[in-house]
């Protein structure tokens, strides 16, 4: 497999994402509470410490976090008198992203996988799920419980309504991703299917199922979604984005 470490997310192909998942070392991630004579057990000497797992604690109680393949060796030690294992992920291929690297507002409960790009001042609300290969533009809000599928491209200053589904494409590898251009508003519980392009400044009504491209500056609604009118002053006033919601300070 070709080296993709220096590639931007936008440059990753379906084939590369498939190989990334297939070839990744699957990990079972756990949180383990341990008690015992930890003073006699130098956990930092165990293989994988600092890279595969971490430890926080004192002389008689602590918490291990990381790859269970390495942590289970510690649990076999006689110095450990009791422990409790909490499973976070099982045979996981792609980890969650380190959200501290994003200059965005990310609320508790959002699930963001690695290999995702999030623009400055974007807002990711509670329960939103963003899959690998997705791109979220500057100032865009992903509302509560929205699903952004693999390789979806969402432009700048969009609002993706609560409960919406932006379809992802990894397989078949020939499938084209969803592209949502700048300044688009998508209503709650709308569904945008694979390969659809939603043109700039357009509006997708709540509950719509979009199966074909949406021209710029149009409003679509229904199942399947159809153009019902051009964006007008009334539409603009009803779908206006609030800049203050995107400020980080």
Swiss-Prot record:
GO BP annotation list: diaminopimelate biosynthetic process; lysine biosynthetic process via diaminopimelate
Keyword Lipoprotein on entry: no
Lineage: superkingdom: Bacteria
Pathway: Amino-acid biosynthesis; L-lysine biosynthesis via DAP pathway; LL-2,6-diaminopimelate from (S)-tetrahydrodipicolinate (acetylase route): step 1/3
EC number: 2.3.1.89
Tagged with keyword Amino-acid biosynthesis: yes
Catalytic reactions on record: (S)-2,3,4,5-tetrahydrodipicolinate + acetyl-CoA + H2O = L-2-acetamido-6-oxoheptanedioate + CoA
InterPro entries: DapH (IPR019873), DapH_N (IPR013710), Hexapep (IPR001451), Hexapep_transf_CS (IPR018357), Trans_hexapeptide_repeat (IPR050179), Trimer_LpxA-like_sf (IPR011004)
GO molecular function, one term: tetrahydrodipicolinate N-acetyltransferase activity
Keywords: Acyltransferase, Amino-acid biosynthesis, Diaminopimelate biosynthesis, Lysine biosynthesis, Repeat, Transferase
Catalytic EC class: transferase
Coiled-coil residue windows: none
Physiological role: Catalyzes the transfer of an acetyl group from acetyl-CoA to tetrahydrodipicolinate.
Family: Belongs to the transferase hexapeptide repeat family. DapH subfamily.
Protein name (Swiss-Prot/TrEMBL): 2,3,4,5-tetrahydropyridine-2,6-dicarboxylate N-acetyltransferase
Gene name of this polypeptide: dapH
């Amino acid at each position: 497999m070709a080296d993709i470490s220096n590639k931007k997310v936008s440059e990753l192909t379906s084939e590369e994402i498939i190989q990334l998942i297939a070839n990744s070392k699957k990990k079972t991630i756990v949180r383990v509470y341990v008690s015992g004579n930890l003073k006699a057990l130098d956990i930092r000497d165990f293989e994988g410490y600092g890279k595969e797992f971490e430890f926080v604690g004192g002389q008689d109680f602590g918490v291990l976090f990381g790859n269970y393949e390495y942590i289970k060796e510690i649990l076999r030690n006689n110095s450990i008198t009791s422990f409790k294992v909490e499973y976070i992920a099982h045979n996981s291929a792609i980890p969650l992203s380190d959200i501290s690297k994003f200059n965005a507002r990310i609320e508790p409960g959002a699930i963001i996988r690695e290999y995702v790009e999030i623009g400055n001042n974007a807002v990711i609300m509670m329960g939103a799920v963003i899959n690998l290969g997705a791109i979220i533009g500057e100032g865009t809000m992903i509302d509560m419980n929205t699903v952004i599928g693999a390789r979806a491209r969402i432009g700048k200053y969009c609002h993706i309504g609560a409960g919406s589904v932006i379809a992802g494409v990894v397989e078949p590898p020939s499938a084209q991703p969803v592209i949502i251009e700048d300044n688009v508003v998508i209503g709650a519980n709308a569904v945008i299917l694979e390969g659809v392009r939603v043109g700039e400044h357009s509006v997708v009504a709540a509950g719509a199922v979009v199966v074909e491209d949406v021209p710029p500056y149009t409003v679509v609604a229904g199942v399947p979604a159809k153009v019902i009118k051009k964006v007008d002053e009334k539409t603009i006033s009803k779908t206006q984005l609030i800049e203050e919601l995107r400020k980080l300070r």
